[in-house]
Regions:
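Sec-type signal peptide cleavage vicinity
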Residues: 1-188
Length: 188
């Protein structure tokens, strides 16, 4: 095994910015960007279809991110098996994975990455639910002291922001009908 350095990018939505929205949790801002847990999935991209070679869970204490500074970068290292083959590295954040088996085709693995939430999304509390994210990158091989940067993470949720600029009208409640209680983490 080889320790691989990773750097993820969590992009802000331009309008409105993450700083102006309500999901702030407690103590720090920009909780929509927070990465609390990471799983690394390594697929053999030299074969068709690509198959799962390795699954590594990253310890949460090894994830570095400064949300108070508005940084959208997440840094950590993970032990990966060396490989001379072309691989696709998928990063899954904030979603508990289970039951993945080596040799499973990539599409089957991605189709099994489903996040379920049966009730209201906890967005503004001590125990808020971090948004599941997915990103991937292909690399020619995994060799000693490799560093993999700029993996762009995509949030699994769509957000509806309501803006009311009038002073004589107050929105008291908003309801979303026919919403899903589960969804795919991967956009693929």
């Amino acid at each position: 095994e080889n320790s691989v350095e990773f750097s993820l990018s969590v992009f802000d939505v331009k309008m409105p910015s993450v700083a102006s929205r309500s999901m702030v949790g407690v103590g720090e801002a920009n909780k929509e960007d927070e990465v609390q847990s990471v799983d690394i999935l390594v697929f053999d991209a030299s074969v068709e279809p690509a198959v799962l070679l390795e699954w590594v869970e990253v310890e949460s204490q090894n994830i570095e991110q400064n949300l108070a500074g508005g940084s959208s970068k997440v840094d950590f290292s993970a032990p990966l098996t060396l490989s001379s083959k072309k691989v696709c590295i998928a990063v899954v954040a904030n979603c508990s994975l289970s039951g993945l088996t080596k040799g499973t085709p990539k599409n089957d693995v991605l189709n099994s990455l489903i996040f379920q939430n049966s009730g209201k999304w906890l967005a503004d509390a001590d125990n808020y639910t971090a948004i599941p994210m997915y990103g991937e990158i292909e690399v020619a091989k995994i060799e000693p002291s490799v560093s993999i940067a700029n993996i762009e993470m995509k949030r699994m949720l769509a957000r509806i922001d309501i803006q009311n600029s009038t002073s004589n009208f107050k929105i008291e409640d908003v309801y979303l009908a026919n919403f899903n209680t589960n969804g795919y983490v991967s956009p693929e």
